[in-house]
Amino acid sequence: MPTVREVTYDLFRKHGMTRMFGNPGSTELPMLQDFPDDFEYVLGLQEAAVVGMADGHAQVTGRPALVNLHTAPGLGNAVGALFNAQANHSPVVVTVGNQTRSLMTVQANLTNRDAVRVPDPFVKYTYEPPRAEDVPLAIAHAIHLATLPPCGPVMISIPMDDWDVEMDASDAAHIINRNVSGRATADPASVVDLSERIKAAKNPIAVAGPDIDAAGAWEEMVALSENQNLGVWACPAPGGGRLGFPESHPHWRGVLPPAIGPVSQTLEGHDLILVVGMSVFPYYPNLAGPLLPEGAELVQITSDPDEAARAPMGDAIVADVKLTLAALLEQLDGTKREAPPAWPGPTRMEDSDTISGSVVCSILKEHLPEDAIIVLESPSSTLALRNQLRISKPNSYFFGCGGGLGFGLSAAVGIQIAEPDRPVVCVLGEGSVQYAVTAFWTAAAYNVPVTFLILRNEEYAILKWFAEIEQVTGSPGLDLPALETARIAAGYGIESRTAGTADEVDKELAEALADSKPRLVEVPVQPGMNLF
């Protein structure tokens, strides 16, 4: 009869999960024993970075990513990254070792005595099977839930003496060979009703969210915009983990502000607001105002029942975004409304003695290959990068929706591993780097050729901006003097350069993007926010 270990690896094969991101400990060694030749193990040096790599990998591939962590300490280290993965709707499947069953009652060293509670509420499913024979079924349960809409992370805790237990081969075959599909179609009546509301609207507008990209629905979203001459705003930056619409398209309106009052003010004059593939709305900070402009109605299309249920206003259709947009297009045959005026191009940036993050982003635009992927975690330069780059291909932009720092650096490594033929550029603030700095080692050790662009402003600029908005004065801990990321990365094996002028940035970026190894370019930039 097959062992639990053998069945589990066959289950992973069935789901295409033959790459494992991990940081092993003694409680995981029995699972990793005789590691299969057709599997790849990607070692990370700290668990938050491990989960971040898997998060990026899962998003860019659209498939579940496998993680293995070390009992309670390792899972604890990873919780912040699981929070990000949940916000990103990433199907990350986490296996965690535990002490042997015979020693759990006495709480021997490394016992995760309440394993299922540690990651809750940041996972869709968390479980420790009562019997060794139940491990493959529990993992299958987790995989199916992780990949059903809305996708999200899951965790299974497995005592270390379960792996050599034998189980029934027939039961194993049933577990392995199951298929579960979950793309829900919208109620036809609700689609017809929405189409009539769009036709009747005098000045409708759309807001495109990250799940358009995850669902592969760019083509349908562009077609809807062009069919009905809809302007399209991008999701507010805090929730804009992916792009749902090409930002070079003349119908693109820009990035919505992230607070209640400014959102309503920005959307004034529109009588119908169609929100696709996102929550309503990812607000932050708290700036009061009306939820909607006067006279406006809102309709949301989302695959996430919770996003629909928690929205404070408007109606919602819960269904697959791509299928729903396709069904909606069948009900529409053009419009007599005039097309919205073309959105202005990128703001021209002027040079100065100390260059700004905006200038660096404009230089990056000149070197960026057409098929490049951008991973961003520079909070003070997010809007500047979006404005300058105008990314216009699907599956090409990733940002941590959860707001927990550490996503960018680690996710970029996981994305580049998944997409070896596409250049990946990771734009980071030097503060963000520190939350997943060990991912530099993985990039160097596995020759993952990410170009890391570090904008060094020696402060938490976004926090100073929030302090102004919140009228908070005298807060400590907002400055980061003398933090030299280039030297840190070099210690992990990354070839690193510092560029202090626009000409130097131009030269170093050109060389980095042409290299087949990971490279880092650190640029000292002006303090403050970069909005354009």
What are these regions (language model features)?
Residues 122, 363-372, 489-494:
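A structural motif corresponding to the C-terminal end of an alpha-helix
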Residues 95, 103-111, 258, 264-267, ...:
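Thiamine diphosphate
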Residues 209-213, 349, 429:
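Conserved short loop/turn motifs at secondary-structure junctions
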